[in-house]
Regions:
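The feature captures the LRR N-terminal capping module
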Residues: 1-180, 187, 191, 195-203, ...
């Protein structure tokens, strides 16, 4: 079957899932956006440079995967997909996201790793249900304070960016268990990280850290800190060194 046959069949059957991965697609036919029943759409490994505005018509979508394409931007209409729970955009060429992504308040998992993001919109603070956020291997220089509002976030991946600092508001992530920030330009870690009561693993390799805040000893669930490839000229505070059950990888 050719592409239009596949799409027409899915429309006739009121399909909930459609896999159009690895089809060599450069453009998406308008007929695709007439399948109002769609809840899951896979467009991975194509040659898409953009998503058309009509993507916003698929209002029942719960999962959208457009990984390993050539996307350079997202349309504002992405914000119309308010039922979306899973958004996968890894391995593209996105340099920014529209502010309308803040409308996607039902998101649970978001992967925008391996892009060219320079910044992230403040509206990320609306993603209160997000559990896993992957932003590693981008070109981020800052993270908005609003990320501290993600009360259900368990895993945050910020490794291999250009961050010189991270906001103190990260200390408000009450559910956070895994925080990866290796391969950045960090010289200090905020004292507020000591409030991360569920944090188990903190990876800070390959930064510019001279020491760590003593407050990290207050992270009662902390099992592992990794600080390889840091200057650490001031050493670690005694409270961290003496913390029972803590493995320090350096």
């Amino acid at each position: 079957m050719n592409l239009l046959d596949i799409i027409n069949k899915a429309k006739a059957e009121k399909a909930k899932t459609l896999d159009l991965s690895q089809q060599g697609l450069r453009l998406l036919p308008p007929e695709l956006f007439e399948i109002q029943s769609l809840e899951e759409l896979n467009l991975d490994r194509n040659k898409l440079v953009e998503l058309p505005d009509d993507i916003g018509l698929l209002k029942n979508l719960k999962s959208l995967s457009v990984s390993e394409n050539d996307l350079m931007e997202l349309p504002d209409t992405i914000g119309n997909l308010t039922a979306l729970e899973h958004l996968y955009l890894g391995y593209n060429s996105l340099s920014e996201l529209p502010a309308t992504v803040g409308n996607l308040t039902n998101l649970h998992t978001v992967n925008i790793a391996k892009n060219q993001l320079l910044e992230f919109p403040d509206e990320i603070g609306n993603w209160a249900k997000v559990v896993k956020l992957s932003l590693h291997d981008n070109m981020l220089t800052t993270i908005p304070d609003s990320v501290g509002k993600l009360k259900n976030l368990v895993k945050l991946y910020l490794d291999n960016n250009d961050l010189t600092e991270v906001p103190a508001s990260l200390g408000n992530l009450a559910s956070l268990e895994i925080l990866m920030i290796s391969g950045n330009q960090l010289s200090v870690i905020p004292q507020e990280f000591g409030k991360l009561s569920k944090l188990r693993e903190l990876v800070l390799d390959a930064n510019q850290l001279e020491t760590l805040p003593e407050a990290l000893a207050d992270c009662k669930s902390l099992e592992t800190i990794s600080i390889n490839e840091n200057p650490m000229e001031d050493g670690l505070p005694r409270a961290i060194l003496d913390k029972k059950g803590l493995k320090i990888d350096q």
